[in-house]
Curated annotation (Swiss-Prot):
Residues 155-164 have a biased composition (Polar residues). One of its GO terms (cellular component) is endosome. It comes from the Eukaryota. Residues 1-110 form the OCIA domain. Residues 205-215 have a biased composition (Basic and acidic residues). Disulfide bonds: none annotated. This is OCIA domain-containing protein 1.
Length: 260
């Protein structure tokens, strides 16, 4: 509760800074809003609702949308009309705002003009952006004097991100990096292994000569001789035996002949 002042009066209440608080619309503004309502319905909501309703109807009829088992395409058509109504109202807001801004001596039009220009009390900054900007101001941003650090008191102390491993003292007897273990006692280090001599490279002439020698050896092999076709077999013609000179062959009544 507000405590009374020394003279018994109460402090004045803090006024709301919103420019449209307890705002009374003028007759011209009410007329403009009614015209906007009628025009948005006739010019936007009615065409959009009719179009979406027809699309829903033909979609159910042609099988693109699934209709209701009892009411058919009616639910889809109603949803299309309602969606078109709200889309039309929303799309006409900018044109309605321009009509109100053209009114003379209109406080609502002045507020809309300030909002479009980005000035005044009402601007286009969202609540999230306003909160972000408020926390980046000087009262919320830490200064160098407010941040506590002990680096100046003990600058020689090494941290987890600044380790001085090269200047630390090491003992020769404790350095077991290259000390042989039981598993590698009989093995030499990689640096002590003898390197194989480099093989001389082969030239094109050497490869050509080697290829010719391999081809000649392949030709001399008995299994690599070319296939020779066999000579065709000639058939001997059998000469018919001459008939006996003596006597004519005997024939029966069927025309068969034989010799005695």
């Amino acid at each position: 509760m507000d405590s009374p002042l020394s003279d018994g009066s109460r402090p004045p209440q803090q006024q709301n800074l919103h420019p449209l608080a307890d705002y009374q619309f003028s007759a011209e503004e009410v007329k403009a809003l009614r015209e906007c309502n009628t025009e948005s319905f006739l010019q936007r909501s009615l065409p959009f609702g009719t179009g979406l309703g027809l699309l829903a109807y033909f979609g159910v009829k042609n099988g693109y949308l699934q209709g209701n088992g009892k009411y058919g395409a009616v639910p889809k058509v109603v949803m299309g009309v309602i969606l078109g109504y709200f889309v039309g109202k929303f799309s006409y807001q900018q044109k309605c705002a321009e009509k109100i801004m053209r009114l003379p001596n209109s406080r609502l039009g002045e507020v809309l003009r300030q909002r479009r220009q980005g000035g005044g009390v009402i601007n286009t900054i969202s609540p999230d952006e306003s909160l972000t900007r408020a926390f980046t101001l000087a009262p919320f941003s830490p200064s160098s004097a407010d941040v506590y650090t002990d680096e100046g008191l003990n600058p020689s102390r090494s941290t987890a991100l600044n380790l001085d491993t090269e200047s630390r003292p090491t003992l020769a007897g404790l350095d077991d990096i290259y000390r042989p273990s039981l598993d590698s006692s009989g093995q030499m280090m990689d640096t002590e292994l003898p390197l194989e001599p480099a093989k001389p490279g082969q030239t094109y002439e050497d490869l050509r000569k080697k290829n010719r020698e391999g081809y000649a050896t392949h030709q001399q092999s008995p299994y690599s001789k070319p296939y020779e076709p066999q000579a065709p077999v000639r058939q001997r013609l059998v000469e018919p035996a001459p008939e006996a000179a003596t006597g004519r062959p005997n024939k029966n009544k069927y025309g068969d002949s034989w010799q005695d």
